[in-house]
Each structure stands twice: as structure tokens, then as C-alpha cells.
Amino acid sequence: YNDRAISYRVHKGFDHADVALSAGVQRMVRSDKGAAGVMFTMDTESGFDQVVFITASYGLGETVVQGAVNPDEYFVHKPIMEMGKFPIIRKVLGSKKIKMIFDTDKSSGRSVKVVDVPESERRKFALNDDEIVQLAKYARIIEKHYGRPMDIEWGKDGIDGKLYILQARPETVKSRQKKADVQQKFVLLGKGEVLVTGRAIGQKIGAGKVRIVAGPEQMDLVQEGDVLVTDMTDPNWEPVMKKASAIVTNRGGRTCHAAIIARELGIAAVVGCGDATEVLKDGQEVTVSCAEGDTGNIYNGLIPFEIKEVKQGELPEIPVKIMMNVGNPQLAFDFQSIPNNGVGLARLEFIINNNIGIHPKACLAYPDLPEDLRRAVEEASAGYENPREFFKEKIAEGVATIAAAFYPKKVIVRMSLSLIHISEP
């Protein structure tokens, strides 16, 4: 009978006395010595159901759920996996700065502690490719069993090295949204100074005055329409989150509490920004855009935007097959829902610009680069053997993501002979 439980039952219309409770007992998976995370049998932002989306970080999974860390992210394409081919189409390295482990103090509330993750481990993916695929296979089995999209928590035991499924429950946001006859698209009508970036949640845009909240004791400061800016959120924040026009957090990934609640409320959120509470100023007017791909941008000032509506039921039948022009892999899962006959042109140079962000010449010249440029290249290519390998992998991921989004329709990619040297040993 805490505040959160009472609020939930009232919101859902449950009688307090009629709700049954139970206690489950299961083996403790030693993910404090391994890794843990959450996976969905669909893309949480677009609702695209042909992928398994996995997040992973070191230590107990509570830090991922809380949004205390920015975890690694992996996308696995279901049809390719079931063909027995390599199915990982995208990997994103998270910062993973902290992890939760067991403490020697056995007293109540003190059995775990949070410690820093060594820099060398942060720059590595928490899971290898075989483990990613194995988790995706588990997720697919669970999804088929229940016959619906699922939200699954998992852990890797650091002692025996095995992967364990800890919890599985129905996905409750995207899967319940019926495919509407009218599609909304938020579009910025201008540009401005980008103050902070992070992981975009949803595809909407919100704007208002910044309200920096250090903790729950300051939640009363948030007014209707404010942009809530904080380090991270937990279930106690939900009443005040409903007032916000947008949410911005320093920490967290796409499966953290702030992201989940933002989807339920239908508002823009940018998580894992790192320094939002330091860069943004209380009372400052900003625009929070999640309408530009995986990266969410917080712009200085109130930038006008519009909401375009397309009534799919009114689209006329035409005698020619219309193919799409797609250059940003980050938007492919969204674009595939628009009526189409595949991709007629995916320019490799656009994929490089949107998916990689490093000029191929910088990869070729590494490490013989100016100090500041060399460090920037190393930072961008962390998690890979070298910048050249990073470049090759990200090109492959970009093409694979677009192909997976539109599968089994045809996707035509315009290659570039000028990149031939990147693939040479």
C-alpha cells in the first residue's frame, strides 16, 4: 500500500481489496559478475515487429531499468535469424559508466552497491555476437509461446557464463496502438543551436521552459508545459511527468523508466544526454526534438514545428509501383510503415553521414592524424578493433538495417567506388 501501488490501482480501476499478491522464489543469477538488461520483441520507438531489441550493461539489471546507465543496444532481425544467417543488423555502444554489484554488508537495504566500471570495459560491448543471437532466440521462443510482443528481463551469470531469462511480460505501449488510418509526422520548421543530444524516445516534438529538478523533493516546481530536466527518474516521478511537455535526462537508455513513461504519455523524451542538467538553465526556453532519427536534439529557443497528417485510407491506387528514397538507416523502421514497393535508392554517402559520422579518409589516415582529430576518431570507433573495422561494420549495419526494415521487398543501394580502399587490408 505505498503511494505508487495505490495510484496504479486507482488509475486502472482495480479495487484495493481484490488485488491478489504472491511471492516468487528463484535462483539468484550472478549478473553482478556478468551483465544484464532488457529486451523487447519489437522496436520500442516505431513498433516495427520484425526485430528483437536488446539492451545490456554490466552488473545487476536494476541500473538499466532505473535509467542509471546508458546501456549497449543491439537489433536482431527475426526473419534472417530463422533462416540461420547472421542476424545482427545494428549495435550501439553505451557508456556503461557504473554497475550495481553485491556488497559484503548483509543488512537490509545495503546488500548491493554501485561502483564505477573501468574505462577498458566501458569501451567494449557487454555481450558478444553469439550471446546476442542466443538472447534473440530466447525472445522469439517466448514471443511465439505467448502470441504477442513481449518485454523481457535477462541476466548473464558471471560465474557459469550462462544466459538466463528472469522475467517476461507483455509489451504494453506500441503493441496496443492500433494502426491508425491517419499517420502523424512532427516536422521542425526551422533550426537552432543544439545544446544537448541523447537517445530519442518516440518521434514527437515538445517545447517549453526548462525546469531542472534535482530530486523528488523539488517535483512541485514543475508547472504544466515545462520541459522536465533531471538526472534520472523512477516510479515516484510519474505524477509530475504527466505535466511535462517533454522529458530530458542525463542517464538512461531506451528501456529505462523515463523512456517507458514518456511512450505511455505520448510525449517527447531524450534520455542519456550526460550533461543536460549542467548545460541547460532553469527557465530557459528550449525545443526538444525526437523527430530526426535515433538522436534526440534539444535546441535553444522555441522553434516552430508542425504536425502533418496523412490519411492512408484516402491514398489512391495507382498503376505504377512507387519505391522510396531512404538515406538514413535510423528512420528506416518508421518509413517501412508508409505504403511502398521497396527502396529505389539508398545512397551510400548518406548512410555514411547518418550512420557513421567519420570521413573515410580519417579512417585511412589513422593513427597519423592531429591529436584532437585522432582522439575524436578513437572515441567514435570505441568497441571496434580499429577505425577501419568500425567504418566497414557501420556501413554493413546501415545497409542491413534498411534491407531488414523493407524485407522482403527490393532495396537498391548505390555504392561508391571511392570507398574501395576502406575494405582493403
Regions found by a protein language model. Name each.
Residues 354, 365-417:
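Active-site loops and adjacent core secondary-structure elements that bind or stabilize anionic groups
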Residues 124-154, 319-336, 387-406:
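Phosphate-interacting basic helix/loop segments used at nucleotide- and nucleic-acid interfaces
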Residues 159, 173-175, 195-227, 231-346, ...:
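Acidic, glycine-rich flexible loop/linker segments
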Residues 1-46, 57, 111-145, 149:
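Extended, highly charged
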Residues 55-151, 202-203, 389-392:
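Conserved catalytic alpha/beta cores of large enzymes that bind or transform nucleotide phosphates
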Residues 420-425:
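Conserved small/polar residues in nucleotide/adenosyl-binding loops
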Residues 1-3, 31-104, 166-196, 243-250, ...:
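Extended active-site and interfacial segments that coordinate phosphate-rich ligands
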Residues 147-172:
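Conserved metal-phosphate-binding beta-hairpin within the catalytic cores
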